[in-house]
Amino acid sequence: MRAYLDLVQHVLEHGHRKEDRTGTGTLSVFGHQMRFDLEAGFPLVTTKRVFWRGVAEELLWFIRGSTNARELEDKGVRIWSPWADPDGELGPVYGAQWRSWRAADGREIDQLQQVLTELRQRPDSRRHLVSAWNVGELERMNLPPCHLLFQFYVAEGRLSCQLYQRSADLFLGVPFNIASYSLLTHLVARHVGLEVGEFIWTGGDCHLYLNHLAQAREQLSRAPRPLPTLHIDPGVTDLFAVRYEHLRLAGYDPHPKLTAPVAV
């Protein structure tokens, strides 16, 4: 995960001071890319403990098409709770857009299922994309998507994925996002009968909140440890049947967790 730590260091040294929606303030740079070879280990940050169950449960929640935070809360995951209404609803956020994008003619489009079908039938297509940035529904979302577009690519029997993240909270969010879309790549590859290739993360506004700087510096003082290995229950190949209990990380030995406030 040296690429991630190098980006944190770069923002600390060269980031522009900017104001933001939350009133917290950030150090920010614009435009950055990181690449992770998924055969070389599962890219989960080791310089602090990352909430693995939260990563996995959130992704499976997206895949189910859910938009209610109570489903996550029932599993001990509260990362979406600050933005939920009293009933737990978040509006048409990620899950709704992935699984039931509302078209202008009233149809609901299952983008994720379309991509799975196309990966099998036309693996060399350049249209293996899923977007969560539905301009017509942004105002109804309690939090517009930060990681808003991902694309799959097949070469030599391997599946790679690139994510575009318009807004990248480097200390709290990005370690989660890297792990989430790396897990998605593994699960989709298994569903369509491919091996894994790379996960490529592309960020727009890459920032550290001003009240995360001390924690970021502490993280940089820690030596990275070997990456864990992801194991998926061999009896489960259907993406839509995967549950947290089917996933296991072997060899995850991170440094202690570092806490920081969430900018809401």
From Swiss-Prot:
The UniProt record lists the keyword Nuclease: no
Keyword Transmembrane recorded: no
Enzyme class: transferase
GO molecular function: thymidylate synthase activity
Residues at which (6R)-5,10-methylene-5,6,7,8-tetrahydrofolate binds: 169, 263
Catalysed conversion reaction: dUMP + (6R)-5,10-methylene-5,6,7,8-tetrahydrofolate = 7,8-dihydrofolate + dTMP
Domain of life: Bacteria
Listed EC numbers: 2.1.1.45
Family annotation (InterPro entries): Thymidate_synth/dCMP_Mease, Thymidate_synth/dCMP_Mease_dom, Thymidate_synth/dCMP_Mease_sf, Thymidylate_synthase, Thymidylate_synthase_AS
Keyword annotations from UniProtKB, A to Z: Cytoplasm, Methyltransferase, Nucleotide biosynthesis, Transferase
Disulfide bonds: none
Signal peptide residue numbers: none
Record localization: Cytoplasm
UniProt GO cellular component terms: cytosol
Subunit and partners: Homodimer.
Name under which the protein is recorded: Thymidylate synthase
Native organism: Halorhodospira halophila (strain DSM 244 / SL1)
